[in-house]
């Protein structure tokens, strides 16, 4: 069984491909058997994803990636950092979840407006033309789901302001950032579990992402943080990830097994480059999800 439970789409967040392209590639050349679309703070693409999974004969888990704020008194002076969690197998029509994600979506638009205002101040210093309402509309039109800085970065490349999206972040978007709408780990857990799903700590040692590596590079200390401060709120850990090395994967698998947690894995593919199905996730990961929750699964194994 080939499994990828961490994929982003253009329909819902910052992926480069739409759902049709993802499923055509996944069912065709990649031969993926179990998949989940995990867009940032958005479940708008889930209905179509379920339909496409059934059409292509791929087993599917409803998914979402939630950005949460987390703090620990022993690190960063107790100041909060951003972490990511993955929600799986929730009811896409749960009214509380839908309402909260709509609030997050609306906040993201207001955040983008404020980021553009900050960018305009930097542009003025450099003699560059300011972003206008038309630019905001164009950025917003580029995505159906959750707006964010990657969409601004892509637009800046298209406008010729920077050569690459990474340059957009390095020169402008880091210093012009505006905080995301705070969502605590406890709130995220209540949202996903309240909708019948499971909450998984995403890529806990990702050196380039929103992970526990922002608190400490020590795997031993990370595991202690999970043990002491997260066990009440998570159902599992994403052990296999495209930016996890073998040591990280092994440490988190052992911890999860000892603590009775689920394990998950995926590429975190944004299709740039295309990594779908390239993380070797063992069959038992899929089996633990499929075993008791068939109501959320469409399609069949090959």
Positions of predicted regions on the chain:
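Extended substrate/RNA-proximal surfaces in nucleic-acid metabolism proteins
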Residues: 54-220, 224
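Mid-to-C-terminal alpha-helical segments outside catalytic/metal-binding sites
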Residues: 278-302
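An N-terminally biased module of ancient metal coordination in phosphate/nucleic-acid-related enzymes
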Residues: 1-82, 178, 183-184, 190-192, ...
């Amino acid at each position: 069984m080939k499994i990828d439970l961490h994929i982003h789409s253009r329909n819902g967040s910052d992926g480069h491909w739409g759902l049709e392209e993802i499923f055509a590639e996944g069912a065709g050349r990649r031969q993926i058997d179990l998949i989940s679309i995990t867009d940032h703070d958005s479940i708008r693409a889930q209905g179509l994803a379920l339909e496409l999974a059934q059409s292509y004969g791929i087993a599917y888990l409803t998914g979402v990636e939630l950005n949460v704020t987390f703090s620990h008194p022993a690190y960063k002076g107790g100041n909060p950092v951003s972490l990511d969690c993955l929600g799986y197998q929730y009811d896409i029509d749960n009214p509380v979840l839908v309402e909260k994600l709509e609030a997050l979506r609306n906040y993201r638009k207001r955040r983008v407006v404020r980021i553009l205002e900050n960018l305009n101040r930097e542009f003025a210093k450099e003699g560059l033309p300011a972003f206008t309402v038309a630019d905001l509309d164009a950025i917003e039109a580029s995505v159906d789901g959750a707006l964010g800085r990657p969409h601004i970065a892509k637009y800046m490349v298209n406008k010729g302001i920077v050569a690459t999206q990474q340059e957009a972040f390095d020169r402008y978007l880091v210093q012009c950032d505006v905080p995301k709408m705070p969502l605590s780990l406890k709130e995220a857990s209540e949202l996903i579990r309240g909708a019948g799903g499971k909450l998984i700590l995403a890529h806990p040692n990702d050196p380039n992402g929103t992970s526990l590596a922002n608190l400490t590079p020590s795997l031993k200390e990370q595991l202690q943080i999970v043990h002491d401060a997260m066990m009440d709120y998570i159902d599992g850990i994403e052990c296999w990830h495209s930016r996890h090395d073998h040591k990280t994967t092994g440490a988190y698998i052992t911890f999860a097994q000892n603590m009775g947690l689920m394990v998950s894995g995926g590429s975190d593919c944004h299709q740039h480059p295309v990594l779908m199905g390239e993380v070797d996730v063992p069959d038992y990961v899929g089996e633990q999800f499929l075993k008791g929750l068939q109501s959320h699964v469409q399609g069949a194994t090959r």
